[in-house]
Structure formats: structure tokens, C-alpha cells
């Protein structure tokens, strides 16, 4: 059983943008299913914690400006994509 407080769950979800999905929950579910294993996350909360930790430590990351003024930050083989408001759109392993 996964233990997480309501406060932590709300905090982790607050870092994410719904992007092109109808809700933040659908965006998170999609990205966890697509990238969870590659970042060694066994559950969605672990994935969100890793995304938050990476996002908080972007010093030295290469930054690429993408469509719609979103930004891709790449560092040590991982990436995070953020929207204009600074909310996470995706997190995963950088493919070369």
C-alpha cells in the first residue's frame, strides 16, 4: 500500500500542468505510464516526487525553448518540460 498524506499529494499535483489533457490527473497518469519505468518509479507518487526533485535542481541544465514558449531542461540524462507558468508538462529520460 502506498502511503502519502493529502497535503503532499496536493503539493505534488500543484507542480503539474494539465497541458493538452482535460485534467492534471489525466496528464500525470499518461506521463507516468509513458515514463515511470524509465525513471525507476514504481508508482505515480514516486514519479511525481522524482519530477519535483529534478525540477528543484535545474542548475547547470541545458535549456531549450520549444513550441508555445514551453521550455525543456536537460541534465544528467533526464529532462523536464515546463509550460509558460513554470508548471511541469513532462519528465523522463533524455533520448539521444
Please report, for each region that a protein language model flagged, where it lies by residue:
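A short, surface-exposed interaction/processing loop segment used at functional sites
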Residues: 77-96
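Acidic surface patches and DE-rich sequence motifs
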Residues: 65-66, 74-75, 83
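Compact soluble domain cores
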Residues: 2-71
